[in-house]
């Protein structure tokens, strides 16, 4: 029966100790992160802005729009050089 050198036993046991320690550290960090995200999700549900819900979205911006008259559109077409037909009274 051959004997295993003592340095090799220390090397293997040291590797296993580091592996166990790193596993423990990562598990505790992951658990803390998930606990914080659970608390944040509970808080965000209560801070919901009600003006941006469903059928109310965009209503504020549609009430105050100004419609341009036909005369204004003809004048702007002249300045832009648009190919729109413009009635001229001579």
UniProtKB/Swiss-Prot annotation:
Pfam families: Bombesin (PF02044)
Pyrrolidone carboxylic acid PTM positions: 49
Methionine amide PTM positions: 57
PROSITE patterns: BOMBESIN
Record flagged with keyword Lipoprotein: no
GO CC, one annotated term: extracellular region
Propeptide: 31-48, 61-90
Official protein name in the record: [Leu8]-phyllolitorin
